[in-house]
Amino acid sequence: MAYKHIGVAISGNEEDALLVNKALELARHNDAHLTLIHIDDGLSELYPGIYFPATEDILQLLKNKSDNKLYKLTKNIQWPKTKLRIERGEMPETLLEIMQKEQCDLLVCGHHHSFINRLMPAYRGMINKLSADLLIVPFIDK
């Protein structure tokens, strides 16, 4: 199947390189657009009772550091049809919205072989809602 627009769910971790390389290979083969998608789920808001005066500054600093890492990853991709989307929202809803807006016909995401992921894989909630093909790349935990 020929893909026109490939979405890649990235987290800002080292494993992103594996996902991006797989997606980039497919994008080059299909002359497709490549969109890296990062969802900032605002996990820091889960603990609203924990607060100290510098909380906002620290959270902003961490977000900037994370975003810079993602921008650097995107900049290093040697493919002119590449872009990065960083959105605030919840998984999988926000990811599905972006996939639809971008008209992606393939989603590339990763999977850790851990006990918790066997019980509750992140992609389980989107399989029945996703209108694109799904490529799940296994991560080998060390």
From Swiss-Prot:
Family: Belongs to the universal stress protein A family.
Membrane spanning stretches: none
Cellular component terms per the entry's GO annotation: cytoplasm
CDD domains attached to this UniProt entry: USP-A-like (cd23657)
Presence of the UniProt keyword Cytoplasm in the record: yes
Pfam families named among the record's database cross-references: Usp
Protein name, as recorded: Universal stress protein D
Natural source organism: Escherichia coli O6:H1 (strain CFT073 / ATCC 700928 / UPEC)
Domain of life: Bacteria
UniProt keyword annotations, A-Z: Cytoplasm
Localization per record: Cytoplasm
